[in-house]
Amino acid sequence: MASSMLSSAAVVTSQLQATMVAPFTGLKSSAAFPVTRKTNTDITSIASNGGRVSCMKVWPPIGKKKFETLSYLPDLSDVELAKEVDYLLRNKWIPCVEFELEHGFVYREHGSTPGYYDGRYWTMWKLPLFGCTDSAQVLKEVQECKKEYPNALIRIIGFDNNRQVQCISFIAYKPPSFTDA
């Protein structure tokens, strides 16, 4: 008796659900959307490297250890570092200075699978610079870290506290004793 009641209730529910779904009416007309077209003067869509396009040559990756963003480029000057820090401040990211004394790159000492102790996590220099608005403050912290640990690799990261992610990371200082190979 109980099984017959359940089956009849299930039939009634499925009929009710079938009538509640609206039929598919198709896609909306594209006339309501604005149309954007490239002008003929845009040479970025040309497949060849002709014209006035100037490409920057990067450092060869062969025999070089890969670090972070911009790692294949030559070392950044203080002016270039300030521009990078200004970029992360403009994006409302929180700058943080980190350093590493032994390895500045990903390495696997105790196995082939990635883990916590494979060089991804560096030591934080002080606390993140919450409320920082000037790149000179960040570069001052880099100089203090360099003075305290002259043989350490130093990097600057930009942390987005809304999305809870690290958005940018680049090497700010390599010690003279460090070799890329």
Swiss-Prot record:
Localization, UniProt: Plastid, Chloroplast
Keyword Amino-acid biosynthesis on entry: no
Taxonomic superkingdom: Eukaryota
An annotated GO BP: reductive pentose-phosphate cycle
Keyword Plastid tagged: yes
InterPro entries: RuBisCO_ssu (IPR024681), RuBisCO_ssu_dom (IPR000894), RuBisCO_ssu_N (IPR024680), RuBisCO_ssu_sf (IPR036385)
Keyword list, A-Z: Calvin cycle, Carbon dioxide fixation, Chloroplast, Photorespiration, Photosynthesis, Plastid, Transit peptide
Entry GO MF terms: ribulose-bisphosphate carboxylase activity
Transit sequence range: 1-54
GO cellular component: chloroplast
Misc remark: The basic functional RuBisCO is composed of a large chain homodimer in a 'head-to-tail' conformation. In form I RuBisCO this homodimer is arranged in a barrel-like tetramer with the small subunits forming a tetrameric 'cap' on each end of the 'barrel'.
Quaternary context: Heterohexadecamer of 8 large and 8 small subunits.
Family from the record: Belongs to the RuBisCO small chain family.
Function recorded in the entry: RuBisCO catalyzes two reactions: the carboxylation of D-ribulose 1,5-bisphosphate, the primary event in carbon dioxide fixation, as well as the oxidative fragmentation of the pentose substrate. Both reactions occur simultaneously and in competition at the same active site. Although the small subunit is not catalytic it is essential for maximal activity.
Name assigned to this protein: Ribulose bisphosphate carboxylase small subunit, chloroplastic
